[in-house]
Amino acid sequence: STFYKIAVTHADNTMKNHFRKDYSSYHVIDYDTITGNVRNKHTHQGYAHESAWARGQAWGLYGYTMCFRETGDRRYLNQAEQIASFIFHHPNLPSDLIPYWDYNDPEIPASPRDVSAATITASALYELSAYSDKGGQYKKWADTIMENLTESYRVPLNQMHGFLLHSSTGHKPAGTEIDVPIVYADYYFLEALLRKKNLEE
């Protein structure tokens, strides 16, 4: 279909232009609207243009896992596996696997975490574990993330105000949504729980 072709073209161009040699990604690619050539590469919500913004890495892992699920194209599976390797072998990933908001923030370990990046990553890993020969490791990482979120990042019952998890970071460079609950963190937490349940049934 037309939409399928558009999605595949978008995925391929993103794989080509968003990612660095180490499989970390930029946040925003500025394309020339006439030629389609890349004009600039930015990391708008990260620490710096060449840094690895944590939620951006999580989106990449999630996105290419979904691309493989929908197409069966093993290039997308490889991309997802390489992004996972970047994340989980990064020297600035904390031992509880809940990332700082940007892997290259020089204020680490004093910089805020981003629980939303962790929940997106966990949900992606559960899905990826069903397709990859590294699935056992991916599920183990996802389980560790979910256990630590449940034990250390839940909003107390009497303070929830509609949220499940605290300590997400939306847009630190703009000074907004820093170390707070964010609704999409809760969404991907619930999605991850459902995927975990389905895997274990």
Predicted regions and their residues:
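Glycan-recognition and catalytic cores of secretory/periplasmic carbohydrate-active enzymes
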Residues: 1-201
